[in-house]
């Protein structure tokens, strides 16, 4: 118990009289805070930024399993991290103090541990890792069913502890290969892609996360099937996919020569080989990326050639795949923790003619950042020990627990022996704007490369200093690294640092990355990673927790989730306004905002405005000074052509990028329809189009005749404080009529909250009058009828409902009905609220029609492709994988 208490900072007080032990947590104040208390303090901390406040409370504030809050603001979190890292620092020479560390973390100003470290450091409530990402893979061949299942189990075990996972499928036999079992031939890659994807979806429940990267070599005979696998609807929905492309393939694409695929891919004597048209397969990659943003491309020869860990490939550090976002190529059972340096904070006198980058302070802080990352490795080893202890104490048999235990033991060994870190950056876009430069201009690229070069040299210098003070990573050998291109650039940049590295070694096998900083950048209130600003002004909405108090609910969707909306100015754009004397309290109209943006350094530099080829060149220039990789996305307009995507991908290879991802606006919403059409003959396509038209625009004679009884779905929503209800009558499972009104009106309809379906019955009386009744089956199995829907709702609402029901019956497509509703102009706020509710109710029936990529969290078409991942600008949701 004393060992346990020491490791996890608990005090164990034994009562000799009662023979009991009282456990006291000494590393944190056990006082709990209400969410309202935390929100009030945190909102002040973030200067009124609602989104940053909610992101921090929901994702990073210290909580126990019951949801009790133990931190009231990020200041408490930063104290927690500083205290724990200072404890590790005290073990080594020249330690940093808790106060020094806190100053680096406070206000997210300089150094920001990301994700796992932020939630896990000093957190004794969770038995989880600090690592953000992992790669798994068995030793030797992994094409047996046993190996495939083992990787599946390892993937799930990591995801249940909040880790993102990547693994490579290149060792699985291609489809049709002979196997020694009852199947006789291999099923190939795709069924196992589905298996791994389904496992990810399964584990991503109840607050757990599941993020997966699947990769394959272009040399594999099933590469084309892999590339097409995600085009089938509802298949492989929980994985990112990337193709590992070698230089030989690219040269064949350029020259038009055939390319040889084989299995096994690295064997001098393959059991199967085939020559393919490289250009044709390349065009398929381009088309799919243009149509659906996948697959991503990994330039594998560049990755391996530049990889410092691969100098030790024969010692277990051979890179096989990447994490889900693609910024950390890893060997099996290695892991990485992430940290970002906030570049904007080093610009003195930002947005003025006197703007200056403080390189002296930057160098000092980068050395601290690398040191902190090494300390976090020690904390991670403690966390893994706790995981291993937890597994050992679990009641299951040793046979059941063996895979998980051995998995974490292998991860621990790699962690101890390689000590890999992921020091990165954020706020590149704001930094160059603050310096008066336009993002991705030649001057901005030169400046950004110089900053990254300084960061690389200082991070490696810090690792060398730590090797002298703490010892080098276990297998360091300067001779192995002397011809590595990245190390050679370091030697040229700082010969003395290189000589010191040869003499003392290096503490960490690899140090640098540029990772996604989705929620991190929300809290730093800056641009993300090396991305440009998304927009200077936009609308966000956040999901309201049912337990939230004193919030404004602007809408409730069909699923019953509540949302709060607010207009957001990009924080550093506001800083520019203040510096240049513009009134930040004024309510600007669209024209005024456009003029304002035009005067700023952000003009022409948003994610949709930048020169795309220059952005790729920027990535290539920065990549020269990053030993791992960079997660970044090139955002393209919907009108972008496949030829442009082709140019971007080729340019990325030529300028030294290790990977490239594009996102064309609207591509996610219509890819399935496009692909299905491309695979049919013109006659079949015409037939399909005719059938689709019949399905959307119903035959008039059939639709006009209303049955007496229609199935009905009930949708509830809320705008401001008003509760609304919609009854959607269905004919052939398609909307035929819709009635809406206030649910909490004095004469409104009160229904059980669990009720979602029923029937609408039309009664026609002898005098010609009509009445609509609603009927449902209660929980006791009895029919319950509510008579006179038309009398329950406001007459004006009822008349508009009759109008909409009419156009639905005549077969107007749902998307056009929504446009019709949206185009109606009303003076009354109540009627406009009704309009918004009807629009949301009808959107449920738009499956397969709506264009654009929607946020899986809030449902809005406001997803920004950024850092190789996706971030919703409405609710703050971000996802890689």
Identify the residue ranges that each predicted region occupies.
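Cysteine-rich micro-motifs
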Residues: 868-878
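Internal maturation/activation junctions in enzymes
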Residues: 101-102, 262-266, 365-412, 416, ...
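Catalytic alpha/beta core of large soluble enzyme barrels
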Residues: 50, 55, 326-328, 380-381, ...
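Cys/His-rich microdomains that often coordinate metals
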Residues: 861-863, 879
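Conserved, charged catalytic cores of large soluble enzymes
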Residues: 10-99, 181-195, 205-317, 348-352, ...
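Short, cysteine/histidine-rich loop/knuckle motifs that typically chelate Zn2+
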Residues: 856-860, 874
